[in-house]
Each structure stands twice: as structure tokens, then as C-alpha cells.
Amino acid sequence: DDSEKRFATRTVHSGTQHIEGAVNTPIFQSSTYYLSDERYAGWAAGAQHTLIYSRLSSVNSEACVEKICALEGAEDGELFASGMAAISTVMLGLLSNGDHVVASADVYGGTYGLMTEELPRFGINVTMADMQDPSSYEAAIQENTKMLYIETLSNPVLKVCDVEAMATIAKKHDLLLVIDNTFTSPWGSQPIAMGCDIVIHSTTKYLGGHSDIVGGAVVGSKDLIAQLFPKKVHFGGAPDPHACYLLERGMRTLSARMPIHCSNASEIARRLEKHPMIETTIHPSLPSHPDYDVGQRIMPKGTGMLAFVVKGGDDAALRFMRNLKIIFEATSLGGVESLIECPFNSSHMFIPEPVRTAAGVVPGFVRVSIGIEDVEDLWQDIQQALDQI
């Protein structure tokens, strides 16, 4: 029983299919599987994990699902071709015309676009609330509200959500509580244990951990995942077996990587707070963070994500980034290498400027995904780049 094993052991062993005695799950680069009588019966009965066709399931996707469920403490799950495919399937699979959702005003840019541009076309309306104030979520609930949507940490301003308080509100009003746990990974927080119904991941990020795949995952109860399975099949956002293999490989080192990501980010945040070229430093480990107390309760191990505001605005921030030699200017996060971006010209490019500013993405705002390099090399790189502004 994997639930009896400790987290690090689950990251290595859960889900691995030792076919033909292989230490790792072999890559089954096949679009289809032999349709035996047993599999045909399972398919006809609607069994979601029957190996028939790789858009439905594959050996490699099943191995990943089992591991993620073991790490999140979930009953079941599905794998997707991207994080947005996972989020879209949850929204369109569990909501219908006339339903209402309450979500965070500073939700991830891709999710914001889905909620403001696509869902209304299907008659699904979204009210944006303040993730830092659970009472604002409760105040936004309507008679037709079906779901509360939250993120463990907001992107990119790193607000910490009081997941337990949100779970209390969701339970009180009999609503689904859906959370994007990408920014902390299962190593950093356990939303299902705190009362969430569905946990979403962009597996591109910390779970994959090497910036070499794009993927998504949804885990939760057997009943909810069973509702989502036919939607996944209909929408077609299935992952490739080779990408699944790389994801499983990446997850095996999750418990080794995450402590370094987090300790590096905490140390650099502490030093940036004292740097004369930095206006504001944002990291949940800092006592100056407005959600410090909540963070210590919800995600005490921290995160490898870091944000700060460079004095001089966006032009100064861009000059700083272009002078970096180790930290790589690129979108995404959660890989072993450090990545940096200005949200105004990347993740939040298509969010109106007043909305960005209200969410805390002010001129000079920089987001960094701190990798597992030596912290002193990272700090020297940051220092020399700031010195050249």
C-alpha cells in the first residue's frame, strides 16, 4: 500500500510498471493496443483505465497517474497534453450553461483568458474575487455557483491562499473546490488533505522538473475523475507516451530537487531585500510577506518561485535580465535551471494593464523560477546584472 510509504519513497517507486523486469517503465510508443475480449468488455463498460487507444490511456500515462495520485493522496486522476488542457477539461467537463464560478482576480494568465473569453461563450460566468480574502469569495457566491477555483500560490505575485478557509466555505455551500497546485507541487502542499476536491498541475513545471515536456494532470475522487474521463476523450488532450515517460522520470527526483529549489529561493530573497536596486522582494518565507503566517500553515516548506520589483521600471528590469549570464530569460518554471521573465511581456501580456497593476504586476516586476544551481553562483549572477543597470 503506497499510502503507508513516506513521500520520498513514493516519488521513486509509486506507479512504476516493471514490465519484463525493467527497473523503469518502458516507453510504449504505440497509438493502439490489442483489443482482447477482456479489454473490449472493459471498454464497453466504460472503464477509463483500459488499454485500448492512447487517446484514452496508455501504459506510460497510467504509471504517471498512479504516481501523482500517490503523491497528492488522491483516489484517481487523468493526464493531459498541457496544463491548460487539464484546466479546460475540468471547467468544461464539470460546468454547464448557466453555471457560475468564483475565481481569483489574479489567476494565471492562461486561466484568466479561459475564464473571461471562452467560458462565457458557453454560458458559464465567472466572478473574480480576492484570493487573500476568503470572505470575498463567499460574498461572490450566487444561487447558480457550482465551483470555487483557487491557486495555492498566485502567479506571479505569490499571494498565498488560505486553502483550509476556502475548503470550509466550499463545504458550507456544497460547492466544488478546485485548486491549481503547480507552484508548490505535492511536496510543498497537500490540498486534498486540506479539503480540496480536485487538484490540477501543469506537469511541465516542478513535477517534470527538466523543462523538456509540456503536460497537465488532474487528480481527485474516483467519482469526479470518472465524470471527467469522457470529456478528456472527447476534447482530445491526451499526452504522448514519450512525454509521459519523461514525466515519470522527472517525478522520481521530486523530493531531491524541491528542497534545493526552496532553500535557494529563500536565501536569494533574503539578500534581495537588502539590495539598494530592489524596491520590493516577494517570497512567502520572508516575514515581510503579507501572507507569511498563512504560508507557514499551508505551505511551510516554501517554494522555488521568487518575485521582486527592480527600481527604474520595466526598462530597468529588462536591462537587468539581459545582463544575466546563468539565469535564463524564458517563460515557464520548475526546471532544474533558473528562469526569469517580466510578466508584462510574457505570461500577462494579454491581461489589460489596469488588471495587471491591480493584481500587483507593477512596472519593474520580475518573476524568477530559482533552479538547483549553487546559490552563490546565482547570487553573483544577480549582483553583476543589477550593477550594470
Model-predicted regions and their roles:
Residues 1-58, 66:
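N-terminal "arm"/small-domain region of PLP-dependent enzymes with the aminotransferase-like
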Residues 2-3, 8-17, 76-277, 282, ...:
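Conserved PLP-enzyme active-site core in the AAT-like
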Residues 5, 10, 116-117, 125, ...:
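PLP-dependent enzyme catalytic core of the Aspartate aminotransferase-like
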Residues 16, 29-35, 205, 253, ...:
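Glycine-rich beta-alpha junction loops
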Residues 35-85, 110-117:
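Conserved N-terminal alpha-helix of the aminotransferase class I/II PLP-enzyme fold
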Residues 71, 272-276, 324:
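Acidic-histidine catalytic/liganding microenvironments
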Residues 236, 324-332, 385-389:
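A common structural junction motif
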Residues 278-366, 370:
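Conserved C-terminal alpha-helix-loop-beta "cap" of PLP-dependent enzymes
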